[in-house]
Amino acid sequence: WKDKTFNGYHRADGQVGTKNVWLFIPLVFCENKNIEKLKDIFENELLPKKEVSYKNLLRSLIEEKSVEEVAEKNSNENLLDNIEVKFINHQGGCGGIRQDSELLAKLLAGYVNNPNVAGATVLSLGCQNLQVDIFKKALKEINPNCDKEILIYEQQQIGTTDQMFQMVIKDSYEAIKRANKIERKPAPISKLSIGLE
């Protein structure tokens, strides 16, 4: 097995993932609504649904277009075909005791540190127990060499929800485009991460 390789996504810290994922996560449950809005926006505009592709395929075949024509059209529709975008929400980050927030910070930092994750957009309200500094500290403790692109937005510092959404959408889209350019390259089997840390 020593000479075996797999094609993976190489991260700056030396980890290698089998997937290329961008995460959207809230530090507090109060941001779940905004995460859900972003999910709706990004899934509808950025990530074409498979069912729609299949419907378009059938519609094109009914219109007597060749399978090759349809495949070429569909390949041009999804410009970001080398990355997945995932949205996480939870019910913590505010109430409870400080240790609850610290444990949640470690959990969320673990998600971001996963070798399959290229980067993340993190939403914070600003007044919750799980502050941005606690999250950053948890990430550094898990992986001091983590150099992933992490976009963090504190809603109360930005101003209106509309202003925040404009920033988050613009910045995240640009970051996702950059992450989409990461290509699979051979890596030794020893770099393969299996299971949970």
Annotate the PLM regions.
Residues 1-197:
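Metallocofactor- and cofactor-centric catalytic cores in central/energy metabolism, strongly enriched
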